[in-house]
Amino acid sequence: EGSTIAEIETKVPYSTDYNKVTDQGDKEVNEGYKPELKPIGVDLKNFDRIIIGTPTWWYHMAPAILSFMSSVDFTGKVVVPFQTHAGWPGTTLEDMTKLAKKNGAIKVEHAKDIKFSSNMSHLDKMETSEKELSAWIKILQ
């Protein structure tokens, strides 16, 4: 069986300037801001399991994911949350789990923490091993 991938995007895009987006992100996370989202183009009623990933922003899920997870009815669904971060995971997975259950998920399983380098010149270097990531993906298949 295949999978369907849907991107969660804000209606108003973030700046491409690193300093501007980090300042904006810090403010939004601290305020619990939930931005307006573009439609994902997928009817979640057709799925039993939903895998949701987020970058970690100031120890929490990104505002777009907070907005999405707050607005979705997960009744009868199994939710698999994952996060990416550079060494400071915070409460992201716990928060995602609580929100999924609050919105009706029957089960939250196989939550995954994916770590990248915190070295500014190597931020795209994944520190979680490919073997570990492949094993997690295999569990989900």
Regions found by a protein language model. Give the residues of each.
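Short, glycine-/small-residue-rich phosphate/pyrophosphate-handling segment
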Residues: 80-116, 123
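Short glycine-rich or small-residue beta-strand-to-loop segments that form or flank ligand, phosphate
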Residues: 48-54, 79-83
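N-terminal beta1-alpha1-beta2 submodule of the flavodoxin-like/Rossmannoid cofactor-binding fold
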Residues: 1-52, 59-61, 66, 70, ...
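A short acidic/glycine-rich loop-to-helix N-cap element
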Residues: 120-128
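Solvent-exposed loop/turn segments at secondary-structure junctions
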Residues: 10-13, 56-60, 85-89, 114-119
